[in-house]
Amino acid sequence: MIAKLKGLIDSLGDDWAVVDCNGVGYLVACSSKTLARLETGTAAALFVETQVREDAISLFGFLETGERDWFRLLTTVQGVGAKVALAILSVASPDQLLQIIAAQDKAGLTRANGVGPKLAVRILTELKDKAGKIALGGFSPGGIKDALSASAPLPAASGRMEDAVSALVNLGYKRLEAFQAVGETARELGDEADSSALIRAALKHLGKGLLG
């Protein structure tokens, strides 16, 4: 089982890289975000997920363990194979995926090749409990590892947050940006803030461009 490759980038393609490790070239499939950070002729270290089948051994490479862990998490969803998981990671970083899933933002997933509305809903539904509470509480260095074992429902306070998010969406904001604004203001105002207070504060954040 190959877990990590360290060597020179021999060549790059649309969805792959060849890593030269002491004269042996390994073909590694990567997301476009990972490929954009690699350069032919330079040294690189890739964390690797190995998939063994009867007819092939496939390697998937990632510059960070967080992206690799998301790849593993995504492929637990029925209908999400390695190719689709990489397509999703090509349009959203691990932190962005946490936000997308916690916000139940279907549009954020359907941007990826191979992800239609039905599959997007399945991904959001199956991963919500694992990723949602991490995004609501802010990101931590081990966030996705915690999410992999998380089974607790979202906090009770999420009801007021969901009301605030829905109100902002009705005002024309995208669901993801509304979720980010409400999450930020909820952390600032604390548990005492009701949905109306969250809406007012979130609108100030959105109006001042304080997010992102």
Swiss-Prot record:
Keywords (A to Z) from UniProt: Cytoplasm, DNA damage, DNA recombination, DNA repair, DNA-binding
Compartment(s): Cytoplasm
Stated name of the protein: Holliday junction branch migration complex subunit RuvA
One GO process term, biological-process aspect: DNA recombination
Region named Domain II: 64-142
Region listing for Domain III, in residue ranges: 156-212
Domain notes: Has three domains with a flexible linker between the domains II and III and assumes an 'L' shape. Domain III is highly mobile and contacts RuvB.
GO CC terms: cytoplasm; Holliday junction helicase complex; Holliday junction resolvase complex
Location of the region described as Domain I in the Swiss-Prot/TrEMBL record: 1-63
Subunit structure: Homotetramer. Forms an RuvA(8)-RuvB(12)-Holliday junction (HJ) complex. HJ DNA is sandwiched between 2 RuvA tetramers; dsDNA enters through RuvA and exits via RuvB. An RuvB hexamer assembles on each DNA strand where it exits the tetramer. Each RuvB hexamer is contacted by two RuvA subunits (via domain III) on 2 adjacent RuvB subunits; this complex drives branch migration. In the full resolvosome a probable DNA-RuvA(4)-RuvB(12)-RuvC(2) complex forms which resolves the HJ.
Residue ranges, annotated region (Flexible linker): 143-155
UniProt record similarity statement: Belongs to the RuvA family.
Any Pfam family the entry gives: RuvA_C
Known function: The RuvA-RuvB-RuvC complex processes Holliday junction (HJ) DNA during genetic recombination and DNA repair, while the RuvA-RuvB complex plays an important role in the rescue of blocked DNA replication forks via replication fork reversal (RFR). RuvA specifically binds to HJ cruciform DNA, conferring on it an open structure. The RuvB hexamer acts as an ATP-dependent pump, pulling dsDNA into and through the RuvAB complex. HJ branch migration allows RuvC to scan DNA until it finds its consensus sequence, where it cleaves and resolves the cruciform DNA.
GO MF, one annotated term: four-way junction helicase activity
InterPro entries tied to this protein: DNA_helicase_Holl-junc_RuvA_I, NA-bd_OB-fold, RuvA, RuvA_2-like, RuvA_C, RuvA_C_sf
